[in-house]
């Protein structure tokens, strides 16, 4: 599929009337529904399974259905359809037959944003964590933003809430071009790399979409871009040349306007024209230090005093599936990460290495999408070779059909001596056999590899003395 940069006119919540969500149990869909319910919009929704978040939405006042049926639409005046909803879904077919407006999740979220000062976080990697950090930092500084995040955040308790201020913080997903539906006042871009080429077709189209995104910023807005990332840095330079908005850069680069020093845990600080300020971070990794610097920059743009901003992340423990601690057994600590791009795998393994110290790092990786594996097989292998052992599962297909000649073997053939392919039924045993006390185990990928973390912890505990 090639990219379309057509932008939808932003609707108001009032214009939508009663809203029905098809696929309401998804992380992104439930976030929008939660905000709409809190803002007084009559909401109903359905999903194929009875997911935990649906009980929360029902308790908040939404009408919830398990299973899909045309009758679930009720008196809906607008419909929001999740990206995984098929064209033959009976509710979607009924909505179209009735002439109801059918919105993408991003269009519904844009309607919820209308009238607020909007902060969006975009980028190939780090969106969920950075959006979470911005939200936690603003809350810690005494503000109460509305927020919508594409991951569950233990520090916040939920992935979305309607706040009392006029600030709206949201993750902006570039994977299908839908981030062009937002109208941000502050736009953070953590990095820009070719990805989602199944949608965009070419790397150039990816870069063009980010240019279109920054063109949405008003004259009194600001682009906050990472000076350490070549793609984000080039975007900042093009935006400055275009001159439609201000640009603020952050990072360890000498010319970054907000300069980051990352000396490891306990030695992270940023310097601005107002001085030098320590960042109290509990999450490891250079990538998280950069994410924190971006959040700090946003806080300053919103008028938060630097001293108030610097300590506000002390209790941030990370977002779900972002180097998330799953447990420990036999002295081996197990973490899980959503990393599904070579850059993300490198960052997650670097964080694991910083935690492991002199001990070993073992990774169980599940490639995500045939198209991504074909495009980045060599880069994945290079990234995985940073681990002491790397076990690679079969590709998680998600929305794709198989591509002839594309399998995990494309990665496996390029792994160093510590790496090999592993069958799903052998994965837990193989990981446990590799790990010794003090080591770190990382499960990585955007598919169901996340289910292996608890199983590995359970197996390690069974082998522990008294287990």
From Swiss-Prot:
Keywords: ATP-binding, Cell cycle, Cell division, Cell shape, Cell wall biogenesis/degradation, Cytoplasm, Ligase, Nucleotide-binding, Peptidoglycan synthesis. It is found in: Cytoplasm. Pathway: Cell wall biogenesis; peptidoglycan biosynthesis. GO terms for biological process: cell division; cell wall organization; peptidoglycan biosynthetic process; regulation of cell shape. The keyword Metal-binding does not apply. GO terms for cellular component: cytoplasm. It is an enzyme of class 6 (ligase). It catalyses: UDP-N-acetyl-alpha-D-muramate + L-alanine + ATP = UDP-N-acetyl-alpha-D-muramoyl-L-alanine + ADP + phosphate + H(+). One of its GO terms (molecular function) is ATP binding. Its EC number is 6.3.2.8. ATP binds at residues 123-129. The keyword tRNA processing does not apply. Belongs to the MurCDEF family. Cell wall formation. NCBIfam families: murC. PANTHER family: UDP-N-ACETYLMURAMATE--L-ALANINE LIGASE, UDP-N-ACETYLMURAMATE--L-ALANINE LIGASE-RELATED. This is UDP-N-acetylmuramate--L-alanine ligase. It comes from Arthrobacter sp. (strain FB24).
């Amino acid at each position: 599929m090639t990219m379309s940069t057509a932008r939808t006119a932003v609707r108001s919540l009032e214009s939508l009337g009663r809203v029905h969500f098809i696929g309401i149990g998804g992380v992104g869909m439930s976030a929008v529904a939660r905000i709409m319910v809190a803002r007084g919009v009559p909401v109903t929704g359905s999903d194929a399974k009875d997911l935990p978040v649906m009980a929360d939405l029902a308790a908040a006042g939404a009408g919830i259905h398990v299973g899909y049926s045309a009758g679930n639409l009720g008196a809906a005046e607008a419909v929001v359809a999740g990206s995984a909803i098929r064209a033959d879904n009976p509710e979607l077919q009924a909505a179209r037959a009735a002439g109801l407006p059918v919105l993408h999740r991003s269009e519904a979220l844009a309607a919820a944003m209308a009238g607020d000062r909007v902060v969006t976080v975009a980028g190939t990697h780090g969106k969920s964590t950075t959006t979470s950090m911005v939200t936690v930092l603003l809350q810690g500084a005494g503000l109460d933003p509305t927020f919508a995040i594409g991951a569950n955040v233990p520090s916040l308790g939920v992935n979305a809430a309607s706040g009392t201020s006029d600030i709206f913080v949201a993750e902006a997903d570039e994977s299908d071009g839908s981030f062009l539906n937002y109208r941000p006042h502050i736009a953070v871009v953590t990095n820009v790399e070719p990805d989602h080429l199944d949608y965009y077709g070419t790397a150039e189209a990816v870069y063009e979409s980010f240019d279109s995104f920054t063109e949405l910023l008003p004259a009194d807005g600001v682009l906050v871009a990472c000076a350490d990332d070549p793609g984000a840095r080039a975007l900042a330079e093009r935006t400055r040349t275009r001159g439609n908005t201000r640009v603020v850069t952050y990072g360890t680069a000498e010319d970054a306007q907000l300069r980051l020093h990352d000396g490891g845990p306990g030695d992270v600080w940023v310097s601005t024209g107002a001085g030098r300020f320590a960042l109290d971070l509990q999450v490891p990794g250079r990538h998280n230090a950069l994410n924190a610097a971006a959040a700090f920059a946003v806080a300053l743009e919103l008028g938060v005093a630097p001293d108030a901003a610097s300590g506000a992340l002390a209790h941030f423990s990370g977002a779900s599936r972002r180097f998330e601690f799953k447990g420990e057994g036999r002295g081996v600590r197990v973490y899980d990460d959503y990393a599904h791009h070579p850059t993300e795998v490198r960052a997650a393994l670097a964080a694991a290495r910083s935690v492991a110290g002199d001990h070993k790092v073992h990774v169980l990786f599940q490639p995500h999408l045939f198209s991504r594996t074909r495009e980045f097989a060599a880069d994945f292998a290079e990234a995985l070779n940073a681990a002491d052992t790397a076990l690679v599962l079969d590709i998680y297909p998600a929305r794709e059909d198989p591509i002839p000649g594309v399998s995990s073997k494309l990665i496996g053939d390029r792994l160093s001596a510590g790496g090999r392919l592993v069958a799903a039924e052998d994965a837990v045993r193989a990981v446990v056999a590799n790990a010794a006390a003090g080591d770190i185990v990382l499960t990585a990928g955007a598919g169901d590899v996340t289910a292996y973390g608890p199983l590995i912890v359970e197996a390690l505990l069974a082998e522990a003395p008294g287990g």
